[in-house]
UniProtKB/Swiss-Prot annotation:
This is Pro-FMRFamide-related neuropeptide VF. InterPro entries: FMRFamide-related/fGRP. It is found in: Secreted. Belongs to the FARP (FMRFamide related peptide) family. It comes from Ovis aries (Sheep). GO terms for biological process: negative regulation of gonadotropin secretion; neuropeptide signaling pathway. Keywords: Amidation, Cleavage on pair of basic residues, Neuropeptide, Secreted, Signal. One of its GO terms (cellular component) is extracellular space.
Length: 196
């Protein structure tokens, strides 16, 4: 098994090295062996016959007259500045004297990081309200957690916790005494003594 994998590894290394060396030597065109000489290459690269794209189309005087009004009609549309180009920097051909849009400048401090509290309160919605919960839910969870902490020390809660955690282990090992159960009973007894 090791000999076969070693042979494959050697073959792989030889193949990659030969490919890499062939690419290195073939980068220079003077070293590439070619079937055609440069003379033949020039002969085949020249276009043959009369090609359609070489013909130049001549415009008549009437066609030039027709194009004149069309160009004049389209120039105002070309010269109009779109609203997205209103804030382009000066290097794109805008002059300093041109009046800039004040609507975009009104939000500039928010973009630069000033006024963060206002921008965050506007842009990020209150998640409990978004999912249909209100601030009263916080108070309800606090009262429930307080009740849970108070009831944790009662014996009925300890029995419930024990039944939730230890019952699967008793089912798996019915013949053995459960050491975990004994540990919980000792802890429960100690807590009851401390409460009294």
């Amino acid at each position: 098994m090791e000999i076969i994998s070693l042979k494959r590894f050697i073959l792989l290394m030889l193949a990659t090295s030969s490919l890499l060396t062939s690419n290195i030597f073939c980068t220079d065109e003077s070293r590439i062996p070619s079937l055609y000489s440069k003379k033949n290459y020039d002969k085949y690269s020249e276009p043959r016959g009369d090609l359609g794209w070489e013909k130049e189309r001549s415009l008549t005087f009437e066609e030039v007259k027709d194009w004149g009004p069309k160009i004049k009609m389209n120039t105002p549309a070309v010269n109009k500045m779109p609203p997205s180009a209103a804030n382009l920097p000066l290097r794109f051909g805008r002059n300093m004297e041109e009046e800039r849009s004040t609507r975009v400048m009104a939000h500039l401090p928010l973009r630069l990081g000033k006024n963060r509290e206002d921008s965050l309160s506007r842009r990020v919605p209150n998640l409990p309200q978004r999912f249909g919960r209100t601030i009263a839910a916080k108070s309800i969870t606090k009262t429930l957690s307080n009740l849970l902490q108070q009831s944790m020390h009662s014996p009925s809660t300890n029995g419930l916790l024990y039944s939730m955690t230890c019952r699967p282990q008793e089912i798996q090992n019915p013949g053995q005494k459960n050491l975990r159960r004994l540990g919980f009973q000792k802890i429960d007894d100690a807590e009851l003594k401390q409460e009294k």
